[in-house]
């Protein structure tokens, strides 16, 4: 999945990849065009919740981060695992924690579910990019090796099956309903917003 943003003379491409059978999302940002070096600011917004509820601003969320190789890790609530947020090249991380309130989910409202959520920012990454340069952001429940993130993104992208025919689309989609979790293999009997 890719989105290209264009503001003035700056063109930034964002590619999002969920890693198959791993609790990790990789996002590659490429500065496709710019008149000069550009400062990219990444401000992750965190929920730390299950799929059936939405986050609301509260005083018990832990806003502290711990430095890890290439980024930080955080755990908003004791019952959740750590979230590792890392980059493929050195970046500055800082800023005060704050709540971004009343995020509006149109599809959830259409389905008749709660549709407004408060998301916590524990800080932001800042990194300078030159024209043609890329950086990969990883969010994972496991610590990654930042030196491998760019290579891993390219490898995982190449592993994606071609979907040029109906049969290829069906095979690819069917594989998404096979879940390997905690040493068990399950077949998802519905959409992912239902409990597995």
What are these language model-derived features?
Residues 1-196:
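Acidic, mature catalytic/reactive cores of soluble proteins
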């Amino acid at each position: 999945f890719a989105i290209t943003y264009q503001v003035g003379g700056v063109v930034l491409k964002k590619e999002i990849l969920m890693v198959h059978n791993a609790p990790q999302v990789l996002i590659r940002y490429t500065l496709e065009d710019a008149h000069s070096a550009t400062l990219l600011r990444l401000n992750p917004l965190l929920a730390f919740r299950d799929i059936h509820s939405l986050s609301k601003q509260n005083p018990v969320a832990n806003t502290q981060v711990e430095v890890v190789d290439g980024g930080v890790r955080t755990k908003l609530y004791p019952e959740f695992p750590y979230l590792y947020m890392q980059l493929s090249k050195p970046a500055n991380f800082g800023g005060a924690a704050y709540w971004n309130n009343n995020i509006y989910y149109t599809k959830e409202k259409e389905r008749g579910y709660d549709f407004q959520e408060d998301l916590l920012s524990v800080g932001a990454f800042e990194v300078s990019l030159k024209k043609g340069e890329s950086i990969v952001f990883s969010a994972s429940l496991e610590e990654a090796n930042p030196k491998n993130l760019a290579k891993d993104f390219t490898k995982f992208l190449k592993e994606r099956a071609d979907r040029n025919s109906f049969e290829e689309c069906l095979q690819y989609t069917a594989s998404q309903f096979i879940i390997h979790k905690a040493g068990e293999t399950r077949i998802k009997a519905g959409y992912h917003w239902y409990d597995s």
